[in-house]
Amino acid sequence: MNKKPARGASAGESAWNRARSLGTLLGRLASLGHPALEDRNPMFRPADAEFPDRRAERKLRLLMCACCRRVWDVLPEPARAAVEAVEKLADENLPDKELDAVESAAYRAVPQSVWMVESHPHQAGRWTAAAFVQDVIGYTPRCLRAARVTKEEQAAEEQAQCDLCRDIFGNPYRPVAFDAAWRTSTAVSLASQMYESRDFGTMPILADALQDAGCGDKDVLDHCRDEKQVHVRGCWVVDLVLGKS
């Protein structure tokens, strides 16, 4: 979902809002100082490892998982297990044995040649999940190609991936100073339920709770109330409420 540039928006912000390529968005995030987005091996790394931008790395993991979940129905079980493991790894550590097991299983689920993505569209989902494991760069062109089920749907899939990115990372040109007073028990409860269930149908109610707590930030409230806005685990507003951003 492309948004019209805000009045007085900088050239960078306008480009962010207009971008239709996930690679372009991630490139802009990297240029703004997110070291995790330049990292070549972010996915199966221990959550307590020392890296300069742990929160950006977590969001990158959740973004790649959200892209994979778009083709969940065609993913083989080992690939699904890998995605679920990476989601868990975003918020907690996994035992080394468990991590090694799901990574190995995901490797075995990888189709052996890229032509399968083009020749057999339903293999695209398998390659999507495997790409971040095998190539360890979830945002490479190969992964983008993989997530597109057919050539005719490429533009729509690119747009969907951009929507996911904007939902997770927010607008880097308009950082929100989140007041801890907005983090009421009602707001936290709503956000926690949505985060765990992946059902974000109560985002408008979260907006009401935040507003009742004194939040007047237009970007926050509009993000919650926009009926066309996609929301996934890692949503920047939900993360702010839960103290994950």
What are the language-model segments listed below?
Residues N2-S245:
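Structured binding/interaction patches within domain cores
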